[in-house]
């Protein structure tokens, strides 16, 4: 043989690029437990004791800002800056990092810095933002672990605004980087860029999605599906920004404020001249995508969206010119050199001509996008736009607040914000909780309060159910929810269907205990929020004693109660669970397999697979089911913390048969010999015996030598959930 062969074919190594998904190809609907194993510590290169909050505190924050400012003003030959300033590019980078947030599930957003990873790094709406991050690399290299990419991208947007004359209201750090793509975020059903399969027959975006097409951050700037329909674009804007959690005023402020800066890039047809996106680019491009073969491929020949031109004659200066020009002129529909629909001013005055970004002395008429004209022609959007036009200071303030909300929405409660520029003002979207101005309870108080709680009319089941109901509203995606604030006693949570079981009774008892304790003359007080957790912990300890073990359940005080006035009812309504497999609850109208929803819930609670297993098994034997059903209560000793759920689920003397009850899959377990009905369970219950990976966990915890191990693991997982919102 003249040609040497290695003895293998490429097919032998496809696992290296398919991510181990060969099993899922055989069984595409099997549970994906990898969702609960993201950012495995073995993947993260930091030392095990690394603490980002501590590292950030060592940062010379204002020196960092100065370095970012210097980078923005130093145009690089490999990617020349428009108008000699990278500010508009950095604003777009920050905006597109934060703008993926959607309020329904809290996913997307700037936290984690997922713009660096697939699929977001390769979306058509993010063309050339890889260059923005490369421009920032010298800064990231210099400051290292003290500043995450997630924080740096947002801070760069802030510095850009400030360097172009805008006064922001501040910045909060604290976003920690992820180290792999997020596989728990649903970006849509489409398999092609800019495809649209996400709208219902009524034209609404289905599910939690906020963007109108695959690969966009929010709306299509050319109009719905690329058609220059201004009023259709207005409808898209309101829905898309609304699902990002923005009001109409905030929406107009963000569009008008953002388009005060920079330009669009469409020197030629992107489908003809742009190479593959970063994830598909050849190895020698080192992660840079969209290589441009038109002309020089940069500067005046840049291709990004395919739209071409700038909005104002002052594209690197904050002013009111975007709105002034929008309302001053009539607009002609034209196509850009790249073939994209846009609007050009009719007979613009000389002083309103836009300077070329790279050729001195050359000028162009200002342009508007279809979505921009929506701010003028849609009555609701136009009313706000005119108010901003007439009152530039009001506009400035509205944009400053909307920008801060956009870039901080998924960072969580204000106590998580880091740095010297955190604004003092509280905003309703931060879910504010008053600061504690009293002395916290001590160990003696905790002991006495536990005794009072356990002597009350509330049962172990009721106390556990209520504590779980409050704590399990937490979602890691945007750090909202949880016990802190005591919002389970406020609207909308107190009226949720799932909270009608046990919760009102327990809250009444705990409020009486709270009022009695707080009558004492000292400065010491206890909040309802702390009492809810303490009651749950006391109940779990009692259940452990009944099992014959003496194991302490940790409790740390420090939660406070908030008010109805500080609670945005509409915003909090999105935290109502469609399903909570831990309480064996699902809304009747939901037809998604319950085990899928269990995995999503466990992911939002930041649980590992073993933690999810012990919590389900433990909550079942404690009887903590919605509506007090017996589903999954595989024990004769309800209220005793034991591994009975797993033992009896795996008992081969029981045979399971499916039935439909109230439009729900229920399974009845019969004694193989007698034919007697023994237990009933849901899909969530039986999945622990059906799924091979979960069965392995169930077998482990069902072992005779792991009875105490099960209890200790339950306590650890319980403690984790109770404290998710304060750690």
UniProtKB/Swiss-Prot annotation:
There is a cross-link at residues 218-244 (Tryptophyl-tyrosyl-methioninium (Tyr-Met) (with W-95)). Formation of the three residue Trp-Tyr-Met cross-link is important for the catalase, but not the peroxidase activity of the enzyme. The keyword Metal-binding applies. One of its GO terms (biological process) is cellular response to hydrogen peroxide. Binds 1 heme b (iron(II)-protoporphyrin IX) group per dimer. There is a cross-link at residues 95-218 (Tryptophyl-tyrosyl-methioninium (Trp-Tyr) (with M-244)). InterPro entries: Catalase_peroxidase (IPR000763), Haem_peroxidase (IPR002016), Haem_peroxidase_sf (IPR010255), Peroxidases_AS (IPR019794), Peroxidases_heam-ligand_BS (IPR019793). It catalyses: H2O2 + AH2 = A + 2 H2O; 2 H2O2 = O2 + 2 H2O. Homodimer or homotetramer. Bifunctional enzyme with both catalase and broad-spectrum peroxidase activity. Its EC number is 1.11.1.21. Belongs to the peroxidase family. Peroxidase/catalase subfamily. It comes from Persephonella marina (strain DSM 14350 / EX-H1). Heme b binds at residue 259. This is Catalase-peroxidase. The active site is at residue 96. The gene is katG. GO terms for molecular function: catalase activity; heme binding; metal ion binding.
